[in-house]
């Protein structure tokens, strides 16, 4: 209340000032650093109009705790944004205390949580497979890639496989054959865009994934997320008796203490292909 007549900046205004300050001319931060902040900010809509100085640590904590649909990685990005904004706000003398230092992430690692698409939901997806957004959902559901891995994948249309992956040692540089039923979808996207996902994953989730599932009335309960496509692939592997070790290999799961498999389990592309092709798509063969 040093100058009561001066309007105190809101969360949105501090964010905008922070971006200008952080990414000022002459700074050499990467595009992906900036994208992380932008992505985190899109989740904070309910804070936009609050006076930044008046925010309490308990409010920020409650806000993070409420974000049930978000993966731990996204929460980490949001908290990192809070920390950076407070760093700027201290510098600009907007606040005298960094409230975000008291906030923590209470979420568990959620890699294993999720709900595969049911047979009924898959049937509906295949029935509408002429839609490009649905094609991407099917690509992920029949290959097991995470949404965050798509844009960096090497796609070999001639030899019909994907190569790439992030996250873990076992997950990096893994090879997954392209299932014949999704090959044309993959080819169309790569030919048109050179990549499977030509937008950031937050945009995709908000403006493509959720709306199309709503339109088809298969949003699911709990609500399906793009990560559920990965769980769908895992479930399909189990349903069609894909070898357990090959399922792990294609999903990039580690073999834990099973050293023999990790070291001697080198599988050729063709061996993996014969496993992934055990997965049938009865919805389509019946229609044709």
Tell where the protein language model's regions lie, with residue ranges.
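Catalytic-site neighborhood detector that most strongly recognizes the C-terminal catalytic loop/helix
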Residues: 165-170, 183, 251-281
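Basic/aromatic-enriched alpha-helical hairpins
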Residues: 12-70, 85-90
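Hydrophobic (often cysteine-bearing) scaffold residues that line and stabilize catalytic clefts
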Residues: 11, 33, 37, 74, ...
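Conserved tyrosine-mediated DNA breakage-rejoining catalytic core shared by Y-recombinases
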Residues: 120-121, 143, 148, 152-186
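Basic, Lys/Arg- and aromatic-enriched nucleic-acid-binding interface segment
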Residues: 72, 76-78, 91, 95-147, ...
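Short, basic (Lys/Arg/His-rich) helix/loop patches that form interaction surfaces
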Residues: 127, 143, 176, 190-195, ...
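N-terminal helical hairpins
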Residues: 1-9, 24-25
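Short, polar N-cap/turn motifs at the start of nucleic acid-interacting alpha helices
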Residues: 156-160, 242-263, 285-288
